[in-house]
Amino acid sequence: MASSLMSNAATTMAAATTTAQANMVAPFNGLKSISAFPVTRKNNDITSVASNGGRVQCMVWPPLGMKKFETLSYLPPLSEESLLKEVQYLLNNGWVPCLEFEPTHGFVYREHGNTPGYYDGRYWTMWKLPMFGCTDPSQVVAELEEAKKAYPEAFIRIIGFDNVRQVQCVSFIAYKPASYGA
């Protein structure tokens, strides 16, 4: 009997505690003052965004005699080892290597007016056929050497073509003529 009295007392006390907790809600004191929140001020000064240890300097690329075009054209001429690595990248992605050359204009140019057009030097002549089934980068470099001998004054580029999606995925200049000078 003593145990049943204790359990009844414990049950009554637990019920009273949960009822009291359910009825306790913090009173609404109104909106908080904005001065209670930390404020960060935005600085509209451009020099605070970029820092090179002092003042910000900009470089202007000389526009005359230093035309740049295509991917990798800002780099020095690629060595044979670098070319082999680039072609291996194409092959690893499942793209078909293809060579194109342009004997007169290596740049986009306006041939038929001063507004952009469809044939503004974007289309080059294909060297032979795309190299479907090629698995060795040295085959592509050998074709590049053959194209250089046939057209020593032409720009030659290597293209990675995705024959499933029917798109050109990558293109870079592999050879610039000696007369170009840069």
Curated annotation (Swiss-Prot):
Subcellular location: Plastid, Chloroplast
Chief localization: plastid
The protein, known as: Ribulose bisphosphate carboxylase small subunit, chloroplastic 5
Similarity field: Belongs to the RuBisCO small chain family.
One GO location term (cellular component): chloroplast
Regions crossing the membrane: none
GO process terms (BP): photorespiration; reductive pentose-phosphate cycle
Keyword field: Calvin cycle, Carbon dioxide fixation, Chloroplast, Photorespiration, Photosynthesis, Plastid, Transit peptide
GO terms, molecular function: ribulose-bisphosphate carboxylase activity
CDD domains associated with the record: RuBisCO_small
A Pfam family matched in the record: RuBisCO_small
Purpose: RuBisCO catalyzes two reactions: the carboxylation of D-ribulose 1,5-bisphosphate, the primary event in carbon dioxide fixation, as well as the oxidative fragmentation of the pentose substrate. Both reactions occur simultaneously and in competition at the same active site. Although the small subunit is not catalytic it is essential for maximal activity.
Factors inducing expression: No expression of this mRNA was seen in leaves.
Transit peptide, from-to: 1-49
Gene that this sequence comes from: RBCS5
InterPro entries xref list: RuBisCO_ssu, RuBisCO_ssu_dom, RuBisCO_ssu_N, RuBisCO_ssu_sf
Subunit structure: Heterohexadecamer of 8 large and 8 small subunits.
Organism: Mesembryanthemum crystallinum
Extra facts: The basic functional RuBisCO is composed of a large chain homodimer in a 'head-to-tail' conformation. In form I RuBisCO this homodimer is arranged in a barrel-like tetramer with the small subunits forming a tetrameric 'cap' on each end of the 'barrel'.
Keyword Lyase: no
